[in-house]
Design a protein with these regions (language model features):
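Short, compact, well-ordered microdomains
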Residues: 57-96
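Compact soluble domain cores
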Residues: 1-65
Length: 96
């Protein structure tokens, strides 16, 4: 069972387009999202992992996680859930 609400799930144009064009990236992005839903914060730094855990417990802050593909450095994505849990976005760091 999910530990927090995600609101509307959206992806930026860059992530969406690459998911449509590349099955490998599509799998990576979906796998990252499943980890995110389990509170597996991927390649996020330790201080942000602690902040994410607190945000899940208290429901009062945004949640941000980082996922890096080991063989494709350009496939680094961020997943961000807004503090009010209204939306969750998959994006490339360059799209922030």
């Amino acid at each position: 069972m999910a530990k927090f609400e995600i609101g509307q799930l959206v992806a930026t144009r860059g992530v969406h387009d690459l998911m449509q064009e590349n099955p490998g990236f599509n799998y990576f992005a979906q796998s990252a999202f499943l980890k995110y839903r389990r509170c597996d914060w991927g390649d996020t730094c330790e201080s942000d992992k602690v902040q994410n855990d607190s945000a899940v417990a208290n429901g009062d802050d945004r949640i941000l996680a980082v996922y890096e593909h080991p063989e494709h450095p350009d496939w680094k994505i961020w997943i961000i859930t807004e503090w009010d849990r209204s939306a969750t976005t998959l994006l490339f760091p360059s799209e922030y």
